[in-house]
Swiss-Prot record:
It comes from Mus musculus. The C-terminus is required for IGF-binding and growth inhibition. The lineage of its organism: Eukaryota, Metazoa, Chordata, Craniata, Vertebrata. Disulfide bonds join C40-C68, C43-C70, C51-C71, C59-C74, C82-C95, C89-C115, C207-C241, C252-C263, C265-C286. Keywords: Disulfide bond, Glycoprotein, Growth factor binding, Growth regulation, Secreted, Signal. A motif (Cell attachment site) lies at residues 281-283. GO terms for biological process: cellular response to hormone stimulus; female pregnancy; osteoblast differentiation; positive regulation of activated T cell proliferation; regulation of insulin-like growth factor receptor signaling pathway; response to estradiol; response to estrogen; response to glucocorticoid. This is Insulin-like growth factor-binding protein 2. Residues 204-286 form the Thyroglobulin type-1 domain. Multifunctional protein that plays a critical role in regulating the availability of IGFs such as IGF1 and IGF2 to their receptors and thereby regulates IGF-mediated cellular processes including proliferation, differentiation, and apoptosis in a cell-type specific manner. Functions coordinately with receptor protein tyrosine phosphatase beta/PTPRB and the IGF1 receptor to regulate IGF1-mediated signaling by stimulating the phosphorylation of PTEN leading to its inactivation and AKT1 activation. Highly expressed in adult liver, but also in kidney, lung, brain, spleen, testis and ovary.
C-alpha cells in the first residue's frame, strides 16, 4: 500500500502514480482488477524542480495538481468545492455532484462538486433507480493512486470491468444523452399540467453555450485507437464558468505530460482574452489586469462625456 501523498515521500511517489478511468466510485471491489485506459506520463526530476516551493499556507494534506500535473497543492477538505479545475479532495474524501444536480457531470466540470466522505454500499444501479439526477455518479479522485471515475455512482464490487475504451466511452456517451432526454421529458410534463406557470428557460450565457458545445463533442467522441478517452479529453478546452454562467477570470488548460497547463485572463462576460495579461504556467493574477481594464474603460467613458 502506498503512503500518503505529502511530506518527503512525495517526489518518490509521483513517478508511479496512474490516472485511471474506472467504473465504480472509488475503485474496484475485491477480486476485480481495474482497467487502465490512460496512464499519466512520469514526473521527471526536471518537472518536479519546476514546481517551486510547496504552498505557503499550512496544509492538512498535500495532493497533486488536477489532471496529470506533478506539483503539490493543498487538498480540499470536507464540504469544500471540487471539480476538474479545482485541487483534489483529501485522501479519505471523494468529489460528488450536489444532490439535485440536473447535470452531475457538468456540475463537476464547472467545479460545483463537493468533497464528501466516500459513499459505501450503493451500486450504480441502485443510484440510478433511487434518483435519476445521480445516474452519472461522481467524479472520484483518489489521491493515492490518482484514480478518476467519470461514470460510476457507487461501489463496483461484483461488476465486471469493461474490456475496451470504446465500450467505456459508449456508456459515458449514453449517460450524457439520457440526461438530455430526461430534461426534455420534464419540460413536456410541465407544459401539459401547468401551462400558466411554465416560464421560458433563461438564456444561456456565452460560457454556458461554449460548455454545452464541449459536452456535446464529448458525448459523440469516438476512439480511433487504444489511447483511451482521457487523452482525447485533454485535447479539449473546457471553459471555466462560475455559478452564474460567466467566465471565470482565469482560464487554464489541463495539466499534461507532467507539466501544468497554461493559464490566461479573460473578460467574464465575453470570454475574450484581456489585453496585456500574460499567458503563463501559473497564476497570472487576472484580477489585477481586469481591474486595470475596468478603470481604463471608466476613464475613457468619462472623457467622452
Amino acid at each position: 500500500m502506498l503512503p500518503r501523498l505529502g511530506g518527503p515521500a512525495l517526489p518518490l511517489l509521483l513517478p508511479s502514480l496512474l490516472l485511471l478511468l474506472l467504473l465504480g466510485a472509488g475503485g474496484c471491489g475485491p477480486g476485480v482488477r481495474a482497467e487502465v485506459l490512460f496512464r499519466c506520463p512520469p514526473c521527471t526530476p526536471e518537472r518536479l524542480a519546476a514546481c517551486g516551493p510547496p504552498p505557503d499556507a499550512p496544509c492538512a494534506e498535500l495532493v497533486r495538481e488536477p489532471g496529470c500535473g506533478c506539483c503539490s497543492v493543498c487538498a480540499r477538505q470536507e464540504g469544500e468545492a471540487c471539480g476538474v479545475y479545482i485541487p483534489r479532495c483529501a485522501q479519505t474524501l471523494r468529489c460528488y455532484p450536489n444532490p439535485g444536480s440536473e447535470l452531475p457531470l457538468k456540475a463537476l466540470v464547472t467545479g460545483a462538486g463537493t468533497c464528501e466522505k466516500r459513499r459505501v454500499g450503493t451500486t450504480p444501479q441502485q443510484v440510478a433507480d433511487s434518483d435519476d439526477d445521480h445516474s452519472e455518479g461522481g467524479l472520484v479522485e483518489n489521491h493515492v493512486d490518482g484514480t478518476m471515475n467519470m461514470l460510476g455512482g457507487g461501489s463496483s464490487a461484483g461488476r465486471k470491468p469493461l474490456k475496451s475504451g470504446m465500450k467505456e466511452l459508449a456508456v459515458f456517451r449514453e449517460k450524457v444523452n439520457e440526461q438530455h432526454r430526461q430534461m426534455g421529458k420534464g419540460a413536456k410534463h410541465l407544459s401539459l399540467e401547468e401551462p400558466k406557470k411554465l416560464r421560458p428557460p433563461p438564456a444561456r450565457t456565452p460560457c454556458q453555450q461554449e460548455l454545452d458545445q464541449v459536452l456535446e463533442r464529448i458525448s459523440t467522441m469516438r476512439l480511433p485507437d487504444d489511447r483511451g478517452p482521457l487523452e482525447h479529453l485533454y485535447s479539449l478546452h473546457i471553459p471555466n464558468c462560475d455559478k452564474h454562467g460567466r467566465y471565470n477570470l482565469k482560464q487554464c488548460k489541463m495539466s499534461l505530460n507532467g507539466q501544468r497547463g497554461e493559464c490566461w485572463c479573460v473578460n467574464p462576460n465575453t470570454g475574450k482574452p484581456i489585453q496585456g495579461a500574460p499567458t503563463i504556467r501559473g497564476d497570472p493574477e487576472c484580477h489585477l489586469f481586469y481591474n486595470e481594464q475596468q478603470e481604463t474603460g471608466g476613464a475613457h467613458a468619462q472623457s467622452v462625456q
